[in-house]
Amino acid sequence: MRKIVHVDMDAFYASVEQRDDPSLRGKPVVVAWRGARSVVCAASYEARIFGIRSAMPAVRAERLCPDAIFVPPDFTRYKAVSRQVREIFHRHTDLVEPLSLDEAYLDVTHAKTGMQLATEVAQLIRTQIREETQLTASAGIAPNKFLAKIASDWRKPDGQFVIAPSRVDAFLLPLKVNRIPGVGKVMDGKLAALGIVTVADLRQRPLEELQAHFGSFGQSLYRRARGIDERPVEPDQEVQSVSSEDTFSEDLALDALAPHILRLAEKTWLATRRTERIGRTVVLKLKTSNFRILTRSYTPEQPPTSQEALAQIALALTRRVELPAQTRYRLVGVGLGGFSDVENGAVQGQLFGQMPPLE
């Protein structure tokens, strides 16, 4: 039986800002550029009390908490701290799969320290992070990645939670289905319309029914409802692509997708900045009302150097969609692929310097 730990830094970017500037401690801090189309990168726990969350439009965050302190993100500092944390992980196992600067999966089945209990490994890792970075992390311990990720949210901030193999059903079945990664508001509503509110409800539905309603995602739902996730922890896997998607509550015409594409371009650009890598290929993904998926991509001579450039290419790709005008779409996604490392400071400044607003 595998022993998987999911470690997630607590309000990472905001916590780094509060650590480095004592005047920010205990105050609602929002890490974001100011601007009509900017989104929140991170919010301190003091800001979250007001309902502010990551990926929320910055203007909405200002309305929710007029006294919030907005701090522009500094990814160079965040990446330096992330390297510190990753070095701590590698003291315990070489099977480390980073998901972003602030979270990772670890397979500690055969920990380097010889420790047998995954809970003790997780506790030691969290203690070392606190002592060496003055930041806190939360951890989930479980037999697979899916369950470990859910568990890491259970005792946030600065806590850990274990789902023992013998307790998987007892933990999983009472959960609301929106606790399953990938089940957002729209999917949650569609499941509720079918009478599926909890994981126990979901488990009662046959695979064929879920696939009929949700296509390939139906199989994922079927497996997650049973706590099944056989994905291995893939050590230090380099990010090859980044994307953001929106599923609509009502199907839309192609010419109604532009506002969504603009917003998704910003989310994708922000996620790209977190990797500090260059994405060269722009990808537009669409799903029609009858679940047909199509993608269009374009690789310019020079990689996009701003969210505006990314958005304009994605918008242009809609003109390559050759379906009848009456076709309606239930999902749109914007992605960047073909990643390579940022090689020098000049290129990094050009790509990841000031983020211009989309007009």
From Swiss-Prot:
Residue intervals of the UmuC domain: 4-184
Source species, domain of life: Bacteria
Keyword Metal-binding: yes
Residues noted as binding Mg(2+) in the record, renumbered to the chain: D8, D102
Family: Belongs to the DNA polymerase type-Y family.
Keyword set includes Plastid: no
Protein name listed in UniProt: DNA polymerase IV
Entry annotation: catalytic residues: E103
Function: Poorly processive, error-prone DNA polymerase involved in untargeted mutagenesis. Copies undamaged DNA at stalled replication forks, which arise in vivo from mismatched or misaligned primer ends. These misaligned primers can be extended by PolIV. Exhibits no 3'-5' exonuclease (proofreading) activity. May be involved in translesional synthesis, in conjunction with the beta clamp from PolIII.
Cofactor note text: Binds 2 magnesium ions per subunit.
Family annotation (InterPro entries): DNA/RNA_pol_sf, DNA_pol_Y-fam_lit_finger_sf, DNA_pol_Y-fam_little_finger, DNA_polymerase-Y, DNApol_IV, IMS_HHH_1, Rev_trsase/Diguanyl_cyclase, UmuC
Biological process per Gene Ontology, one example term: error-prone translesion synthesis
Main location as per UniProt: cytoplasm
GO molecular function, one term: damaged DNA binding
GO cellular component: cytosol
Cofactor: Mg(2+)
Keywords associated with the record: Cytoplasm, DNA damage, DNA repair, DNA replication, DNA-binding, DNA-directed DNA polymerase, Magnesium, Metal-binding, Mutator protein, Nucleotidyltransferase, Transferase
Catalytic activity: DNA(n) + a 2'-deoxyribonucleoside 5'-triphosphate = DNA(n+1) + diphosphate
Annotated organism of origin: Xanthomonas axonopodis pv. citri (strain 306)
HAMAP family given in the database record: DNApol_IV
Assembly with partners or alone: Monomer.
Enzyme Commission identifier(s): 2.7.7.7
The gene coding this protein: dinB
Site label Substrate discrimination, positions: Y13
